[in-house]
Amino acid sequence: MSVDPACPQSLPCFEASDCKESSPMPVICGPEENYPSLQMSSAEMPHTETVSPLPSSMDLLIQDSPDSSTSPKGKQPTSAEKSVAKKEDKVPVKKQKTRTVFSSTQLCVLNDRFQRQKYLSLQQMQELSNILNLSYKQVKTWFQNQRMKSKRWQKNNWPKNSNGVTQKASAPTYPSLYSSYHQGCLVNPTGNLPMWSNQTWNNSTWSNQTQNIQSWSNHSWNTQTWCTQSWNNQAWNSPFYNCGEESLQSCMQFQPNSPASDLEAALEAAGEGLNVIQQTTRYFSTPQTMDLFLNYSMNMQPEDV
């Protein structure tokens, strides 16, 4: 079916007739002889639009957008799912650390060196690693782990032992000497410092004690106290030997003007008394006297008793 060339001019007229309420513009139509062709073309246009309408931009947007009834917000991933997906992506990236297995000989050497020296220099670590056929990093890591273990052990066990020591070391009988000791017995969690504090064992306390010792020695251990009259020779002389001398001195004092015969008689009396005393002491000091007393006691009869 042929369409006249006036059809393009008649199309705006048809559109204008449909929306004449919105636009009251005057409509200009072609001649009357072209009117039937215009009606045919206008009748065919809706048919072609219904059969194959051209897709517009709005139609494309509607087709791409999801239907709210079928999938309401279900296709959009949440933040939790995103984080889980990221973690799953990162898990295979992590590398598991290979744990070094030391032999018994290596452990013995390392422990011995750690007991003597806890911190090694770079050169010492390199020498030790060469001796043990280990890498520098392995030796360094082992020493770091061992230091942490020792500190943890001291932190867990040191307070218990220190409390027991302080309780057992109490000495109430000597408060003047041990009062500073209890104050200086402190707990050391790190284990690097000595147990005794500098305040308790400083030079001032020791100097005071030495001064006290000197004063004690000067007052009590001097020679004057020991060299008394009780330790002289007169105290050790027996009264038996002094009897004659005393009698002689008494005779000399009370008879200054006596004649010579009286003096000789006094000397003889003093000498005889001295000899008698010496003989009696010698007689009683011999073992024969002891035997006599024993025999006499054994031979005594009940009648005599």
Swiss-Prot record:
Impact upon substituting residue 140 to A: Decreased POU5F1 promoter DNA-binding and protein stability
Sequence repeats: 196-200, 201-205, 206-210, 216-220, 221-225, 226-230, 231-235, 236-240
Function, in words: Transcription regulator involved in inner cell mass and embryonic stem (ES) cells proliferation and self-renewal. Imposes pluripotency on ES cells and prevents their differentiation towards extraembryonic endoderm and trophectoderm lineages. Blocks bone morphogenetic protein-induced mesoderm differentiation of ES cells by physically interacting with SMAD1 and interfering with the recruitment of coactivators to the active SMAD transcriptional complexes. Acts as a transcriptional activator or repressor.
Gene Ontology CC annotation, any one: nucleoplasm
Family annotation (PANTHER family): HOMEOBOX PROTEIN, HOMEOBOX PROTEIN NANOG-RELATED
Residue segments, region Sufficient for strong transactivation activity: 241-305
Signal peptide: none
GO biological process, one term: somatic stem cell population maintenance
DNA-binding region: 95-154
Gene Ontology terms, MF aspect: DNA binding; DNA-binding transcription factor activity; DNA-binding transcription factor activity, RNA polymerase II-specific; DNA-binding transcription repressor activity, RNA polymerase II-specific; RNA polymerase II cis-regulatory region sequence-specific DNA binding; RNA polymerase II transcription regulatory region sequence-specific DNA binding; sequence-specific double-stranded DNA binding; transcription cis-regulatory region binding
Family: Belongs to the Nanog homeobox family.
Protein name: Homeobox protein NANOG
Impact after mutating residue 147 to A: Inhibits POU5F1 promoter DNA-binding
Organism for this UniProt entry: Homo sapiens (Human)
Region (Disordered): 1-96
Compositional bias per record (Polar residues), positions renumbered to this chain: 65-81
Tissue specificity remark: Expressed in testicular carcinoma and derived germ cell tumors (at protein level). Expressed in fetal gonads, ovary and testis. Also expressed in ovary teratocarcinoma cell line and testicular embryonic carcinoma. Not expressed in many somatic organs and oocytes.
Compartments where located: Nucleus
Substitution effect: residue 141 to A: Inhibits POU5F1 promoter DNA-binding
Main location: nucleus
Keywords, comma-separated and alphabetical: Activator, Developmental protein, DNA-binding, Homeobox, Nucleus, Repeat, Repressor, Transcription, Transcription regulation
